[in-house]
């Protein structure tokens, strides 16, 4: 497991393994600059217990509240404990496949087309869809 802090090229905190990486974003899509022990603990626990508590789906199109968020990404199909923290974002991605998915309490994530294809390298800076 590799833990990298914000650098010049990648300004978001992440914990990366062979298959996925987790990043934490504020609600305004700005990266977290001050890495607290809580953030590190949450991300570490998520990395360790990820296969137990979460169900991943390889998807081509992800829709959140009827709005298409991103293509070529992986989305959660279950709730994420981090949504107890208001305005938190979760990044889950295969290598070279990165996306930002806003997760809130009782937020349905609609998944279509269970096909994974190669996508862009950059993390899209998206805003929350209007309610």
From Swiss-Prot:
Q: Which GO terms describe its biological process?
A: copper ion homeostasis
Consequence of gene loss (knockout): Increases sensitivity to copper.
Organism in which the protein naturally occurs: Saccharomyces cerevisiae (strain ATCC 204508 / S288c) (Baker's yeast)
Topology versus the membrane? Multi-pass membrane protein
Record keywords: Repeat included? no
CC terms in the record's Gene Ontology section: membrane
Q: Does the keyword Transmembrane helix apply?
A: yes
Question: What sections of the protein cross the membrane?
Answer: 35-55, 74-94
Keywords, comma-separated and alphabetical: Membrane, Transmembrane, Transmembrane helix
Q: Which gene encodes it?
A: ICS3
Q: What is the lineage of its organism?
A: Eukaryota, Fungi, Dikarya, Ascomycota, Saccharomycotina
- Localization annotation: Membrane
What main location does UniProt list? membrane
The name this protein carries in UniProt is: Increased copper sensitivity protein 3
